[in-house]
């Protein structure tokens, strides 16, 4: 037993320096929504700490990024995961099974799942029920036969349902299902009963998206969605609020339940698609790569994520004061998240 403990300690001591020997640059993967914020932080960080190199930021989507992040410890694996939703219990289990046992969770701000369209489009307001009936593969368990928005709601125009949105690897796709589609689905008495008896089937019916061409996966590239909307009147795009904010000359936001996606409505959570954004730090890499601490410190500065921070100019919505204080403490202490608290 003593030999095994000594051997394990030796492996740990050898493996961590090996990361630094192989690379000194920090590497982050994950959310396309968090990407522009992480990129801006990386640029500031590189100017402040030129000897540490410019952090490498990759836009892979939250789900795909989690798989890479949780695949192991060592120079081949990312140091940080950017996420547009919280880590799932299944992802924490994957991390733990691959030796990634200590991860720090840091909320960096807020964003909203925005519905955008060309400024020339007649659509201006949708309810969550409208969106569910238009996009669900089997709304309330029945095949989706709706071809136009008027089929969904007689008060809407008779234009074809054509929505550009994120793929299954995206945290924005998860948020679409959880925040926008599930509430009107669960409001149905039959679906509420199903949730108690068969949660997996309930989730499939409430969050499953149609595959007949009405919903088009646009990849992990919100800028591509912006281009599609500008070129195709009467289509709708699902993207992060920051991308809508940056393209207000071309696009307009669609109200959901009568609430426009704005800084104020997301900050107050009165907008149904408001959600927190996170970064996850692989603690086992921190000692070997000083650039990780420098990046995390820059990302959580009040001058970055506060109400007057430079990331607000990029479309980030500042989290409440108490949340920012917790995030700044987490960045300093790097206390690991309790995997058991994740769902």
Language-model features: where?
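Bacterial N-terminal signal peptides that target proteins for export
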Residues: 1-7
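Bacterial N-terminal signal peptides
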Residues: 7-15
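Sec/Tat signal peptide C-region and signal peptidase I cleavage site
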Residues: 16-22
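Flexible loop/hinge segments at secondary-structure junctions
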Residues: 22-343
